[in-house]
Amino acid sequence: MSVDDSADVVVVGAGPAGSAAAAWAARAGRDVLVIDTATFPRDKPCGDGLTPRAVAELHQLGLGKWLADHIRHRGLRMSGFGGEVEVDWPGPSFPSYGSAVARLELDDRIRKVAEDTGARMLLGAKAVAVHHDSSRRVVSLTLADGTEVGCRQLIVADGARSPLGRKLGRRWHRETVYGVAVRGYLSTAYSDDPWLTSHLELRSPDGAVLPGYGWIFPLGNGEVNIGVGALSTSRRPADLALRPLISYYTDLRRDEWGFTGQPRAVSSALLPMGGAVSGVAGSNWMLIGDAAACVNPLNGEGIDYGLETGRLAAELLDSRDLARLWPSLLADRYGRGFSVARRLALLLTFPRFLPTTGPITMRSTALMNIAVRVMSNLVTDDDRDWVARVWRGGGQLSRLVDRRPPFS
């Protein structure tokens, strides 16, 4: 087999996770090649919200000044079940603000950081096959046009469906809760509103309470990102027509937000969540971000996990036996939180759970403050307050009784 190009590190996927990994690897002096099927800038279905944890990662990448030119969000405005509450971003370990940037802009900006750091880009190219040596190390990739690309190490960041990950043995376990979502964009005079708005009482046109939420995330550019998402499992699939649902949700909020017309650029996504995949690493390769199901089961957020796992993967490139080290690192860092979050998210798929607990929770500001913190991945191992201790302890107990723990 002849090799047409090669790199020390090949990264497949130039979204936030892949570009972050490429940037950190290039900063360490490695020869990095990034391959992506798209040409940039390109859109991606997403809520576009950036939690304080994501903001912190962007600052580490050197994008703090760039982010300062975008909207700042104080926290979450949550409404439903007869109540509404505004909760500032909590937690001592992260910045006190979030933001929102359309993925069309965000992904290309992070990609340019990697490129400016020295990573080479091969865009508009699709990796379709992997080749191993006798010790099962990946030695090269085949692209759709027949080009062979050699590599010493491989980082796979090709998204929720992860076609290359599947070729490497990745398996998604759909009995664990997953998400379905749709989003679009609408113009409004309230695009500078400093709150990310979530409607927790999401109903279908016939009045049934759905296991999910609707959102309106101001972008500060004259538009908002509007969308709806729901939770599902193989046993209790969310039988939703997403595009009619976002249209219905838009009509419900039309007067309040001054919307005219229907959302543009409507796009949907399927989201493996909470580490509900196995086969995330081999001897010299790793899956990161959405490809490793690093998505929050309680809100569908994945950008902060993508940025973090990209950085962590780059830090492990000198290690041997990634097949053991990478799943262990993911489980240690995210396993407890993902386990208990999956369990809570599963409860939301039971029809009577939300109508029973929603009104009680919405009446308690203290409970909503706790909910925002844990739902937004703002608890760290260094936090010593009682909420952090209870969350970590609950996650540890939950993981002990998991039939299939995260990343296994």
From Swiss-Prot:
GO biological process assignments: menaquinone biosynthetic process
Pathway(s): Quinol/quinone metabolism; menaquinone biosynthesis
Disulfide pattern: none
InterPro entries in alphabetical order: FAD-bd, FAD/NAD-bd_sf, Geranylgeranyl_Rdtase_fam, Geranylgeranyl_reductase, MkRedMenJ
One cellular component term from this protein's GO annotations in UniProt: peptidoglycan-based cell wall
Entry EC no(s): 1.3.99.38
Function: Catalyzes the reduction of a single double bond in the isoprenoid tail of menaquinone (MK-9) in M.tuberculosis, likely the beta-isoprene unit, forming the predominant form of menaquinone found in mycobacteria, MK-9(II-H2). Is required for M.tuberculosis survival in host macrophages.
Cross-referenced NCBIfam families: GG-red-SF, MkRedMenJ
Family: Belongs to the geranylgeranyl reductase family.
The protein's name in its UniProt record: Menaquinone reductase
Source organism: Mycobacterium tuberculosis (strain ATCC 25618 / H37Rv)
